[in-house]
């Protein structure tokens, strides 16, 4: 899926969590006794009834995380962590930072975080700072239930280079994420997702191994 398609899914899901429309997950917003919700389609899958792929998962058909994976991760309390899987505070830039193909890489840059404040930089220049408090009115139902708002920055004119997000709690940087504009394909990078598991060659463990096409700096070349 392209950046724009992934962002469309993120916006749809966060609107559902915020209590808008028919797909309000069993009246989650309206019912104070509803403890939470789960996503049925964790991964993209091949439909049995038709020859097509359903792109409704938060990971792709190979279990590689999509943007919405990190959107849902931002709903986790920053005090909660599980060694080997995730640490409490998180921040993620939902962009490939590539103007040529995606209009959403140029102006509105979305950042997911479960922290109090987010700063976004382009090539070391501050684009803006947003706080959880400032964003709450747009996502009140989510925040009141312990979730997090989306942080959306108007980045203005596009520049190749690096986007960097900093997440802050009590004025201190607790998490960062950077995305650099990809260059030409240069190498294959092997990414082994152990998720804290020490694999044993006894036939019981299955560990996904991904081969990513990257440029000379290690940035993912998303369209290769």
PLM regions: where:
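Extended substrate-binding grooves/exosites of carbohydrate-active enzymes
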Residues: 1-172
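Short beta-turn/strand-loop junction motif enriched in small, turn-promoting residues
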Residues: 22, 98, 197, 216-218
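Generic structural detector for well-ordered beta-strands
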Residues: 152-156, 178-180, 191
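Edge beta-strands of extracellular beta-sandwich domains
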Residues: 171-183
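Low-complexity, acidic Ser/Thr/Pro/Gly-rich terminal tails and inter-domain linkers that flank the onset
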Residues: 182-202
